[in-house]
Amino acid sequence: MTSIIKLKVFSGAKDEGPLCYLLQVDNDYILLDCGWDERFELKYFEELRPYIPKISAVLISHPDPLHLGGLPYLVAKCGLTAPVYCTVPVYKMGQMFIYDLVYSHLDVEEFQHYSLDDVDMAFEKVEQVKYNQTVVLKGDSGVNFTAMPAGHMIGGSMWRICRITGEDIIYCVDFNHRKDRHLSGCSFDNFNRPHLLITGAHHISLPQMKRKDRDEQLVTKILRTVRQKGDCMIVIDTAGRVLELAYLLDQLWANQDAGLSTYNLVMMSHVASSVVQFAKSQLEWMDEKLFRYDSSSARYNPFTLKNVNLVHSHLELIKIRSPKVVLCSSQDMETGFSRELFLDWCADQRNGVILTARPASFTLAARLVELAERANDGVLRNEDKHLSLLVRKRVPLEGEELLEYKRRKAERDAEETRIRMERARRQAQANESDDSDDDDIAAPIVPRLSEKDHRSFDAIENDSHCFDIMAKWDNQQKASFFKSTKKSFPMYPYIEEKVKWDDYGEVIKPEDYTVISKIDMRKGKNKDEPVVVHKREDEEEVYNPNDHDEEMPTKCVEFRNRIEISCRVEFIEYEGISDGESTKKMLAGLMPRQIIIVHGSRDDTRDLYAYFTDNGFKKDQLNTPVANELIDASVESFIYQVSLSDALLAEIQFKEVSEGNSLAWIDARIQEKESIDNMLVAGASQLTIEDSLQEDAVEVVEEDVIPMETFQDDQNKQEASEENVAEGEKSNGQSKENDENASSIPIETQPKIRGTLILTPLPKKQIPVHQAIFVNDPKLSEFKNLLVDKGYKAEFFSGTLLINGGKCSILVERLDSKWRVLSQKTFTNFGSCSTTSLLFCK
């Protein structure tokens, strides 16, 4: 092992924070995940910022925000340009996760960290890969990586990173070896004793229920809630584990014996329709049983979800009658529909809340999990029923704030109208005839638009199917200074567009096939006219939280509210992560040479560390870093990269050995090639010394030659000039201060930058005598062929190698699998093939 391997931990070690690690393999830097949580702390991004120009690739393991939530920020605000690698489902579902996150925050606050455009720009850098597809890192480093199924979420990956020399680095966090309804479990069969294992200890010390018992408990709690005429909210993520629960509940609703078909099943998020649509097209990433055909021999897609209602807003949810079961995002309940529904439903004792995961301890969901574990069959204790929560929401403007908003909006509208009218006036002037004698052409009259027509004018101006018969002002600016009898664009202007073609024919523009599907009655100030909204026939209507900004102005408010929890609160684990006992056995079975434990609380990390030490692993093989810690995972304590000089390569004499390989002795010494920075510093110091000597010499000569009177006059002039430029020097003093400080530092005390280490050839007098070595296992038959090539007569006779008709012989006896020399007659004139002792192996 000769590679330099280091791991820098930025977040996600001995805590429940987002995951972000920087792996260094020689000169390549690979970023392993870049998550973010609801706290949106910028600390670890600032620590990561200096390394961003060095990053060669980013590997994303799972689509949830804890693994890729910080990617848009790194691309938009930190300047990340390296390619991002993930599987196809992680790419699609990751976008859904981040979209839902941004929409949820825009519903209650002004989200400033990144926008939807930043999300799109970040995912444009993603290169999608498949399982078991080997991707070679760009450059000549020889580093490649492969995604292996993790079994936790659709498309979730464990990454195997290899060098060309064959050393493996395994990065596996949040994996599941058990088979789910829609996913197959992970497998470690393809991993053979890696050099470094980077793994997580997330919830490794917590017990887990069996799948059958867990499903029965879920159905029981749902039935108890809906039969009491209550609504049941199941808190789940946006596009990951929600597929498992949606598929399970859809099957239960389809089963008439379950007794759930009379109630409504709802999946609620800002991107619910898109999540289901993507799931339909990603069956190849799921378990093989989902490819089976139904009884009608037609292809059956299990994620059609016929019994699930997809909603994207509260208005759509209200239209669905109660009792109902709602799969609601987000999982930590810090924002999103899950928090809003909890605030609305917690006061009714008929309702129920089922939590399916243990998020970070600072979240509302984590507090409710603790209360549920202390509760009696979902009913909280009296001392646990009251919580003080921060409530954030958007409210419409009222009173003075609304008047101020209308005043500013009127000013903006007036300015926009003035600009449009000025543009129209210039276009009208451009259409006037250059020929003053032509009375048939009248200048077009542009009527002044009233305040009521402003919105209609915008609709016409923005419509892609409307054309202005007046020539554009920009075209008229290119006309000649002299009058021309030829009119530019006398009638309807027409510019023929070049039709684009591809392999399938003419490229279709979707906007050419839009239809007017509905009339949106949006009432502004004194505007009752309808606004035409264009919509594609196959386009689904997705809730956009910014739509209400056009209807009425709003503002974000927040306040503390003390709530009473009367509903049932229960916890059923559906995280899809391997249990602790199985995780320990699988990781120990890999027999890695070094282990780095990340992504887990201090107790979980300590538990996994103790298991490894009790099962034969040495303490120097285990590392449990904390945030902002650098781990050196190289085998040798000191590794340096050395280059071969051209002079050494010219003197090397290679000898061919078996299987096309070549070997050579290298007799050289290690020298440090001075870096360019040191050469520049040395050159600057030399120039500084020479300049100072020249200045001193000039001053001495001038003092010897110049008379005293002239010197006194020059001194007076110099004092006067110094007074005149005093102000200028004062203004430039700040900028010169740094240069003076830098120049005042002695050159010798400045740090020396290490240069490149190279191997240079030794003088021939210093080259030692090399002893003979044997490469591989020599065979007696090969030695016979060598003698024949040298002109000797050699043949086998009863286990004896006869040379030159018996004049020189070697008596060989076979003992087990060895050839042992029993006796040997020396002979002369054998040249380079003479030897005094031989040991041949079969």
Curated annotation (Swiss-Prot):
The keyword Nucleus applies. GO terms for biological process: mRNA 3'-end processing by stem-loop binding and cleavage. One of its GO terms (molecular function) is RNA binding. It is found in: Nucleus. Residues 414-442, 708-747 are annotated as: Disordered. InterPro entries: Beta_Casp, CPSF2, Cpsf2_C, CPSF2_MBL, Metallo-B-lactamas, RibonucZ/Hydroxyglut_hydro, RMMBL. Its main location: nucleus. Residues 731-747 have a biased composition (Polar residues). Keywords: mRNA processing, Nucleus, RNA-binding. Belongs to the metallo-beta-lactamase superfamily. RNA-metabolizing metallo-beta-lactamase-like family. CPSF2/YSH1 subfamily. CPSF is a heterotetramer composed of four distinct subunits 160, 100, 70 and 30 kDa. This is Probable cleavage and polyadenylation specificity factor subunit 2. It comes from Caenorhabditis briggsae.
